[in-house]
From Swiss-Prot:
Pfam families (alphabetical): NTF2
InterPro entries assigned: NTF2 (IPR045875), NTF2-like_dom_sf (IPR032710), NTF2_dom (IPR002075), Nuclear_transport_factor_2_euk (IPR018222)
Entry's Gene Ontology molecular function annotations: nuclear import signal receptor activity; small GTPase binding
Cellular compartment(s): Cytoplasm
Designated name of the protein: Nuclear transport factor 2
Functional note: Facilitates protein transport into the nucleus. Could be part of a multicomponent system of cytosolic factors that assemble at the pore complex during nuclear import.
Keywords: Cytoplasm, Protein transport, Transport
């Protein structure tokens, strides 16, 4: 499978953060039962547990401002991609907080799912 990782990473991040910022409950289709989220040091496994964590975050209005997106192939066999995102997280109108997030994207037919998702505030 030939992948333009930079285009894939950009399109994925635009979709992910737009969905996160408007309705986090709709992110479940991006994960599988074996997917894992590490959110500021706490691990959550499976699509349902991940969405429960994201929906349960203690803020209302949120906006991600992406600074940089870097992508690389994750294996020589092809298809999967590692994505590193850095930016600022604006929550409920407070001062922006710097963050980093890593996604490991795995091909699934004509689309991709998130196998690993690691989020860390850099404050």
């Amino acid at each position: 499978m030939s992948v333009d990782f930079n285009t894939l990473a950009k399109q994925f991040c635009e979709f992910y953060y737009q969905t996160f910022d408007t309705d986090r409950s709709q992110l479940g289709n991006l994960y599988r039962d074996h997917s894992m989220l590490t959110f500021t040091g706490t691990q959550h496994q499976g699509a349902q547990a991940i969405v429960e964590k994201l929906v349960g975050l203690p803020f209302g209005q949120v906006r991600h401002k992406i600074s940089d997106i870097d992508a690389q192939p994750a294996s020589a066999q092809g298809g999967d991609v590692i994505v590193l995102v850095t930016g600022e997280l604006c929550v409920d109108g407070d001062n922006p907080l710097p963050y980093a997030q890593v996604f490991h994207l795995i091909p699934d037919g004509s689309s991709y799912y998130v196998f690993n998702d690691i989020f860390r505030l850099n404050a």
